[in-house]
């Protein structure tokens, strides 16, 4: 229960107690002068035409105030039996023949009984108390304080109302019914204002509670996340195995370390460039430099055929440099791999077959052999010179064969054609079994 309501109830109860205490004091002061409204039966019978009857068939009750005195019957139209006349404990007033009023406020109104004297007497409509007074025993008059109720009983006119003051004053007791407490007027306004305040307070409390709980949940989540997160391992071998570690860290340990490492993607700036240098271009540059140096050492520049051979060899070496891996010179076993030339006994048959087939068979390199290298210019010149000398020596003396001498131009053309065919189709595969450290043979005297 709200404390405001409790305080308000206590305050109203205090006011109620003070109000009824004042009424009790007023009744004690006025007990010395009670007013009793009586009339004689003779006067009532004399004015029998003015007497009123109960139209609803309800009996009227009489109250005997003193011996030999009674009150005239009253007419009541409310449908309730009228009690006998009794003295009011608060402020009784009566209309007499002189025009003095008598007023008493009750809660329920009762209709007026019309008589000729216009004198009002007020009774209670709910209960039927009887006030009886005697000289020996004072009666207890039950007084119910109500508001907004009026009734009037008229007594015959032109008769003086006698007021008797008995020697023994009756004691009046006031009974406060539980329904007599006035209603609280402030309840209507207070009930309208308190629900709004309660709503605002509840909304504020809910918001504060939600904020506090959300903060606690967030703190707990952050703490758990930091505790459950795995610590970062400080790997000393993040860059791989050290080149200076001579077997100190075995490969098994390295494998375990690499498995535990988190795979990270690493990209270099070179991958973003549009052109990347390849090994083939580098090897081609090396071969061009070596060929240029070897060409400077050659003194035999008078022969145009040799220059033509150099140009052809340079073109073939540059074309084949893309598939090569190492630019080194050919081994010294090039001469041993060449088959000997066939004996040229029939010159006429040789002349007829020169244009169709070459005179010597050449071994072609394997396509899958990655170690096949082009021969250098020095080796080609040396081989060409050797074959030339062998071809010259293979011819028998002209005198022994008894053949006519061939013309000089024919001999030169034959030699030139043989050299061109041999040099163009000459490619020697290196011997993998031969030792590369074997010394090369000295160059021929013609090249020097």
UniProtKB/Swiss-Prot annotation:
The modification Phosphoserine is found at residues 268, 271, 278, 294. GO terms for biological process: myeloid cell development; negative regulation of apoptotic process; positive regulation of granulocyte differentiation; positive regulation of neutrophil differentiation; regulation of cell cycle; regulation of stem cell division. Residues 227-448 are cytoplasmic. Induction: Up-regulated by full-length CEBPA. The keyword Iron does not apply. The chain crosses the membrane at residues 203-226. InterPro entries: EVI2B (IPR033239). Residues 74-108, 298-372, 427-448 are annotated as: Disordered. Bone marrow, peripheral blood mononuclear cells, fibroblasts and Epstein-Barr virus-transformed lymphoblastoid cell lines. Strongly expressed in granulocytic cells, and weakly on lymphocytes cells. Residues 1-21 form the signal peptide. The modification Phosphothreonine is found at residue 249. Keywords: Glycoprotein, Membrane, Phosphoprotein, Proto-oncogene, Signal, Transmembrane, Transmembrane helix. Residues 22-202 are extracellular. GO terms for cellular component: plasma membrane. It is a single-pass type I membrane protein. Glycans are attached at residues 16, 50, 114. PANTHER family: PROTEIN EVI2B. Required for granulocyte differentiation and functionality of hematopoietic progenitor cells through the control of cell cycle progression and survival of hematopoietic progenitor cells. This is Protein EVI2B. The gene is EVI2B.
């Amino acid at each position: 229960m709200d404390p405001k309501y409790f305080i308000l109830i206590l305050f109203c109860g205090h006011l109620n107690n003070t109000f009824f205490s004042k009424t009790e004091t007023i009744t004690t002061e006025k007990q010395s002068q009670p007013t009793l409204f009586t009339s004689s039966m003779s006067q009532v019978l004399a004015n029998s035409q003015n007497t009123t009857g109960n139209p609803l068939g309800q009996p009227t009750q009489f109250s005997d105030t003193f011996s030999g005195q009674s009150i005239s019957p009253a007419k009541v139209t409310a449908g309730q039996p009228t009690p006998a006349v009794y003295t009011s404990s608060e402020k009784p007033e009566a209309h007499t023949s002189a025009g003095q009023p008598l007023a008493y406020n009750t809660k329920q109104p009762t209709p007026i009984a019309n008589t000729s004297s216009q004198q009002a007497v007020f009774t209670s409509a709910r209960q039927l108390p009887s006030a009886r007074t005697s000289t020996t025993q004072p009666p207890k008059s039950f007084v119910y304080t109500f508001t907004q109720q009026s009734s009037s009983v008229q007594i015959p006119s032109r008769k003086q109302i006698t007021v008797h003051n008995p020697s023994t004053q009756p004691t009046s007791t006031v009974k406060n019914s539980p329904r007599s407490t006035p209603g609280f007027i402030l309840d209507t306004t207070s009930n309208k204002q308190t629900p709004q305040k309660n709503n605002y307070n509840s909304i504020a409390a809910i918001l504060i509670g939600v904020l506090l709980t959300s903060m606690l949940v967030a703190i707990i989540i952050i703490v758990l996340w930091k505790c459950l997160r795995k610590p970062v391992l400080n790997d000393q071998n993040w860059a791989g195995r050290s080149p200076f570690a001579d077997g100190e860290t075995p490969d098994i340990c390295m494998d375990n370390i690499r498995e535990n490492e988190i795979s990270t993607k690493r990209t270099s700036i070179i991958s973003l460039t549009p052109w990347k240098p390849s090994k083939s271009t580098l090897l081609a540059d090396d071969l061009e430099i070596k060929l240029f140096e070897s060409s400077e050492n050659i003194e035999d520049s008078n022969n145009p055929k040799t220059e033509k051979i150099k140009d052809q060899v340079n073109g073939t070496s540059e074309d084949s440099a893309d598939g090569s891996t190492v630019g080194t010179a050919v081994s010294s076993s090039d001469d041993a791999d060449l088959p000997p030339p066939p004996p040229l006994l029939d010159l006429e048959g040789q002349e007829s077959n020169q244009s169709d087939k070459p005179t010597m068979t050449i071994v072609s390199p394997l396509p899958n052999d990655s170690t096949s290298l082009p021969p250098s210019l020095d080796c080609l010149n040396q081989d060409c010179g050797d074959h030339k000398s062998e071809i010259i020596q293979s011819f028998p003396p002209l005198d022994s064969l008894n053949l006519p001498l061939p013309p000089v131009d024919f001999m030169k053309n034959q030699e030139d054609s043989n050299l061109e065919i041999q040099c163009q189709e000459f490619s020697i595969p290196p011997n993998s079994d031969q030792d590369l450290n074997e010394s090369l043979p000295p160059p021929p005297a013609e090249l020097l």
